[in-house]
Amino acid sequence: MVEIHDSRMDRGAGAVRLQKILSRAGIASRRAAEKLIIEGRVEVDGQLVRELGTRVDPDVSVVRVDGVKVVVDDSLVYLALNKPRGMYSTMSDDRGRPCVGDLIERRVRGNKKLFHVGRLDADTEGLILLTNDGELAHRLMHPSHEVSKTYLATVKGAVPRGLGKKLSVGLELDDGPAHVDDFAVVDAIPGKTLVRLTLHEGRKRIVRRLLTAAGFPVEMLVRTDIGAVSLGDQRPGCLRALLRDEIRQLYKEVGL
């Protein structure tokens, strides 16, 4: 790692002090940001920076703290939506069916073009991420980054003890093998079982097809997590901005 001590590294019109950038991005207070710089935990364009007087143009340079990219562009939008059951994941629908675009149009200003991360079937409820950060969206959706997704599924029948192991080993589906990374029984009532499962792929209807292949058709399905972002107590139809820490964790998961 190259280390620099030149406070004149950027004299551009948009250059501001590095600690101010970190503070504005919500990384730390101004004083705590200064400590991060002195400790050698901050990089600018791949170079370690330790001088507090360093000025950087956040629109040009890439700033990282502990190897994780700092998001400083105020025009970028990061949203979490709990898509209701019966709603389509598209931004528009030529047949007039209810879709995610209907919610976005009413609640997001500025006509921003948003990318979906993690589309869901109309009959599945749960977490969808929406952002105009194209690079992050692309990486989150690309199979090579293996971003985990967690679901709660209500299935027919009583689930036997060995089902989790069976799903972890994997089953052969029409489009190839599939397996879960984690599986647990959450609750059970006569004739039905609530299970939680985590997997890192996003093939169409993969959870429903996998559980059906195992002999347990899905009655209801909710996605609760995508990577570091959780649905929590967010109700169907509710839209919220991601926390800065959630954004940082997503960046870390995909190597940005």
From Swiss-Prot:
Residues 16-83 form the S4 RNA-binding domain. CDD domains: PseudoU_synth_RsuA_like, S4. GO terms for biological process: enzyme-directed rRNA pseudouridine synthesis. The active site is at 121 (nucleophile). Its EC number is 5.4.99.-. It catalyses: a uridine in RNA = a pseudouridine in RNA. GO terms for molecular function: RNA binding; rRNA pseudouridine synthase activity. Keywords: Isomerase, RNA-binding. The keyword Isomerase applies. InterPro entries: PsdUridine_synth_cat_dom_sf (IPR020103), PsdUridine_synth_RsuA/RluA (IPR006145), PsdUridine_synth_RsuA/RluB/E/F (IPR000748), PsdUridine_synth_RsuA/RluB_CS (IPR018496), RsuA_PseudoU_synthase (IPR050343), S4_RNA-bd (IPR002942), S4_RNA-bd_sf (IPR036986). Belongs to the pseudouridine synthase RsuA family. This is Uncharacterized RNA pseudouridine synthase ML1370. It comes from Mycobacterium leprae (strain TN).
